[in-house]
C-alpha cells in the first residue's frame, strides 16, 4: 500500500535568492541519517539583505501560522490579502520572544529537509489542552529512496548571540522533548480529532500514528534544530569580496569547533 503523504505549505521559489548555503564537511557523527546545513542571508555591500528576508517571510507567514484548513478558508473567501496581517496579529498575541527562529525552523524543514508541516508552534499553542508541547514544530518526514519508515520530526529553535549558548539551549530543549516524547506524540494524535488539520493531513497523521485493529503504528521520531547567532565580523574591515569569503570561513570554523563536542 502506498505511503500516505501530506503536501508542503511553503512558497519557496525565492529561497535561493534570499539565503546562501555555506559548504562544509562536518557531521555530528550520528548512527542514523543526519543533515548539518549552514545558511546565511544573501549579502550586499557587506550587509545582510534583510529586505529580501522580509519579503520572503511576508509571503509565507500565513502559511506558517495558519493550518491548511484555515489558509484554504482565506482562499475560498477570496481574502488572501488579509493573510499576512492576520498571521502577524496572531503571532503577536502569542509571542514568546522566539518568533523569528520558529518561522525559520519551519522554512528550513519544508525547503531543505522536505518535511511538510503538521503543526507550527502557533498551531500547537492554539490546540493544546492538558498537554503542553515543548517543541516549536511538528513536521512529517516520509519515506524516500533511502528511508523506509516515516518520522515525526520535533523541531526546536534557538536564536542568541553566541553559537555555544545557542547550541546548549537547543540541546537542552531536545532532551526535554525526548523525555516527554509520548506526550508530544499524543498531542499530534489529538489533532486528528479536532478541526485544526485539514481532512487530507488529518487522515495521513491518523494512518501513521493510530494503529488499526490488530496492528501497531510504525514510525520513528527525529529532531531538528534551528540555530541563529551573531557572526561577529566587523564589515568595515573588509572589501565586498573579502567579507563574503570571511563570512563563509567564519561559519565553517564555528561549525567545525562545535559539531562533535
Predicted regions, residues:
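A structured, charge-rich N-terminal accessory region that forms the first stable segment of a protein
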Residues: 2-82
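Short amphipathic alpha-helical segments
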Residues: 49, 53, 97-105, 162, ...
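Short glycine-rich, low-complexity/disordered patches
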Residues: 67-78, 97, 187-191, 261
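A short, surface-exposed helix-loop junction/capping segment
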Residues: 77-94
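Extended, Lys/Arg-enriched charged tracts that mediate electrostatic binding to polyanionic substrates
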Residues: 100-133
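Glycine- and acidic-residue-rich phosphate-binding/metal-coordinating active-site segment common to enzymes
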Residues: 118, 126-207
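Acidic, metal/cofactor-coordinating or nucleic-acid-engaging core segments within structured domains
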Residues: 168-260
